[in-house]
A protein has these predicted regions:
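N-terminal pre-domain segments of enzymes
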Residues: 23-69
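Bacterial N-terminal signal peptides that target proteins for export
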Residues: 2-11
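N-terminal signal peptide c-region/cleavage motif recognized by signal peptidases
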Residues: 19-20
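Short, well-ordered loop/turn sites that connect or cap secondary structure elements
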Residues: 86-89
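Sequence context surrounding c-type heme c attachment/ligation sites in exported
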Residues: 26, 102-328
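Short alpha-helix capping/helix-loop boundary micro-motifs
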Residues: 76-81
Length: 328
């Protein structure tokens, strides 16, 4: 059997992972971590904090339940413009699920996978747990998994998707910056919003601070996100927020699309680097015969929109996390 480059990469990743003296072997069952009071209903334990982010990645209309466990007497550090600096022992938890009927979420969800990012002396370790059919537990799996999923949409339409849980090596393609795996979502501009906690609504950053889970917070918080689907924000800021959430994890310096010279992180200000009148470095048929990544005022002549609208695996962007077009 031929050994592909991807298989070699996968093997080397785990060789390094398990040769680290600081790496404790992960649990085989998600329930063994005791992150949840009710694992099926995703009700967290008292030492696990639920959260949401302002502009989440589109993942084929899946719902995501996010949580973080920070060790007792430890705290994350606020870092302006970037992901919070979490202490060793932190676990970031994200469960992907689809509702039975989106018109009535009380009917429940079909849980598919729970991803963990575990921080230890080695760095951040990605792990994926696949849920059983009985929805009683999820089991560690390194090689990915595919689900055929159906659900009823808000419009009462039956929807279908072939949902792919990535293998652990694929996690690096989105989470690796300068050859180090790190979280993506928990940063000031994503967290500076309200969350409905069991004891009432509160700003997430204030809530974390009051629970001594976040320190070094600026006196004036000026990281206020433009919500991409909120018409109260101007269209330019909404577009930048969407592209930052859905593209910038790869399209930024030091990330997997570094060589493209095309970056979409919010703090990028150079129009050429943002793709204005920029020809692709190597898009192949992904260019669709178009000349510029962004042709201002001409979205139908822009490679960016062409690839975002495509569902062809050889063309579409992002390459992972979606099989459907984001109609909205």
């Amino acid at each position: 059997m031929a050994i592909t480059k991807n298989k070699i990469s996968f093997f080397l990743f785990f060789l390094i992972l398990f040769s680290s003296a600081s790496f404790a072997e992960p649990y085989k069952n998600l329930s063994e971590y005791n992150f949840f009071k009710d694992i099926k209903k995703q009700i967290p334990a008292d030492n696990v904090i639920p959260y949401k982010i302002a502009n989440p990645l589109f993942s084929d209309y899946s719902y995501k339940f996010r949580f973080v466990h920070i060790p007792e007497n430890k705290a994350a550090e606020y870092s302006y413009g970037s992901v919070f600096k979490f202490p060793i022992g932190t676990t970031i938890i994200k469960t992907f699920a689809y509702p039975i009927d989106e018109r009535n979420l009380e009917e429940g969800f079909k849980l598919l996978e729970t991803r963990l990012l575990v921080k230890n002396d080695f760095g951040w370790i990605p792990l994926s747990y696949i849920w059983n059919d009985e929805q009683t537990n999820a089991y560690l799996k390194y090689t990915g998994h595919t689900f055929n999923v159906s659900w009823i949409s808000e419009k009462g339409e039956e929807k279908f998707v072939r949902y792919r849980a990535p293998n652990v090596n694929q996690c690096k393609s989105c989470h690796e910056i300068n050859e180090k795996i790190q979280p993506i979502g928990p940063k000031g501009r994503n967290m500076n919003i309200d969350f409905n906690y069991q004891n009432g609504k509160a700003n997430q950053i204030d809530y974390w601070q009051k629970r001594n889970l976040l320190k070094n917070i600026p006196n004036i918080l000026n990281e206020n996100p433009a919500i991409w689907d909120d018409i109260n924000y101007n269209i330019s800021d909404r577009a930048r927020s969407y592209l930052d959430a859905n593209c910038a994890h790869c399209h930024q310096k030091g990330a997997s699309a570094n060589n493209s010279g095309f970056y979409l992180n919010l703090d990028e200000t150079n129009n050429s680097i943002l793709g204005f009148y920029k020809s692709p470095v190597a898009a192949g048929r992904g260019s669709g015969g178009l000349k510029y990544i962004i042709n201002p005022g001409k979205p139908d002549e822009s490679i960016l929109l062409y690839r975002m609208n495509s569902t062809d695996p050889g063309v579409m962007m992002p390459e992972l996390s979606r099989n459907l077009k984001h109609e909205e």
